[in-house]
């Protein structure tokens, strides 16, 4: 009788083990496309890797690729050079739709975890320039000196779209006697400090280190995005958002802007049980993630499944987890 009872207990116990724990017996080798060493996304990738190594089978490896960036990361997945990648909602949507930064549709992308943080498309002017709005800049055709991120980056594409929404182009600004210089974060910051640039248009987080440092040495105006421009930018997947007051020195008022969250995407051929486990581990460890990087304080696990609004298909393994948790009906 006791023997039969023990057998019954073992059978019931085996059914209680999550499916992915039973199926994942062999090591998993994953590559996650992030960004340069020291970037927020590289830290994100390292943080995820640390959590995943604790739950994946012994011998599993996770390589965080120290290159890429939002537009490039989708291509790395398509080429088979990465299994996972960070992107922004708008830019992943461009990849799926084959527009803006992409000449054709990328059909292998799926979503795992969204709403990881909050990025803002900020236009930051030095006070000495006297510029208080991009609308004023367009109307007066001022010979402004603009800096942004390198060509092909999310920041440079975003600057181009933002200027176009205000009726400006790079060529027009140059014809007014101004300049447009896509460059590195360090060079852009230095040019703003040295008075060689008037406006820096950049995709930033709240408390972005380079902008925070700039605000300590240079008086700045954080230019608001007009409501009509916000609506135009929405056509490209940007969301209406607000930079809270006092995030940066001298920025004592809320600033209406557009922006987007970081998302984790994966190749559609990633095994379902792996996708399930990776998703579960991130969703259930927000506290640990916040310890690793402050950007995760804006992570919204309850919204992480909402890829439908960006026309990005959800990976079946991730969808299974969200339905099990009652997040999706």
Predicted feature descriptions by range:
Residues 138-161, 240-308:
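Ligand-binding clefts/hinges and TM-proximal coupling segments of bilobed small-molecule sensing domains
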Residues 27-55, 60-64, 121-194, 308-317:
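Bilobed "Venus flytrap"/periplasmic-binding protein-like clamshell domains
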Residues 194, 199, 204-216, 222, ...:
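An extracytoplasmic/periplasmic, membrane-proximal ligand-sensing/linker region
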Residues 17-21:
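Sec/Tat signal peptide C-region and signal peptidase I cleavage site
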Residues 1-4:
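Positively charged n-region of N-terminal signal peptides that target proteins for export
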Residues 73-120:
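N-terminal segment of the mature folded domain
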Residues 6-15:
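Bacterial N-terminal signal peptides
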Residues 89-91, 99-101, 111, 125, ...:
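Pocket-lining segment of extracytoplasmic ligand-binding domains
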